Amino acid sequence: MSDLIAKTSMDRRMAEIVTPSIEALGFEVVRIRVMGGKTNTLQIMAERPDGGIDVDECAQISNAISVLLDVEDPLEDAYALEVSSPGIDRPLTRLKDFETFEGYEAKLETTEMIGGQRRFKGVLAGVEDDEVLVNLEQGSETVTVGLNFDWLSDAKLVLTDELIKEMLKQRKDAGLINETQFDDIEEDPSNPED
């Protein structure tokens, strides 16, 4: 099975260490990456099973796994721990993500050449067995292609106005946006641009 959550052996090692604690807190791991640079960064993306996560919940995860990582000490060098939401243009790492975001535009890459290409951009059309279905524009036609999940090396949603609008609507419907915290928009009746 393809592992888009934790790609490298170090990512998988970190996942083995932190995933049980994150799940015990009631969250799901979306992606784990150890990224190099001047200082290594351990990036963990998580969310509630129903989607979404707030800053306080990220801090809760960070505090819980910081203690664990101090004990396990899996990284030799200094590192920064970054716990965040997957974001709007999120990575798609689990088969269920492709069902959840059916109807939205995504970019996908495969490890194998399929029809002479490895990169695809289209509208997610769900899942059938272990295949991710994608509607691709080919000329004036739309063709549905099934990509084996195990062949995927990368996948993420494309940031579109439609996606932003839907995510904001979901947050508002879930009561996560309190409109009373925003300033009222004042219009100047003497200014024709308002």
Swiss-Prot record:
It comes from the Bacteria. One of its GO terms (biological process) is translation. Keywords: Cytoplasm, Ribosome biogenesis. Transmembrane segments: none annotated. InterPro entries: Ribosome_maturation_RimP, RimP_C, RimP_C_sf, RimP_N, RimP_N_sf. Signal peptide: none annotated. It is found in: Cytoplasm. GO terms for cellular component: cytosol. Required for maturation of 30S ribosomal subunits. Belongs to the RimP family. This is Ribosome maturation factor RimP.
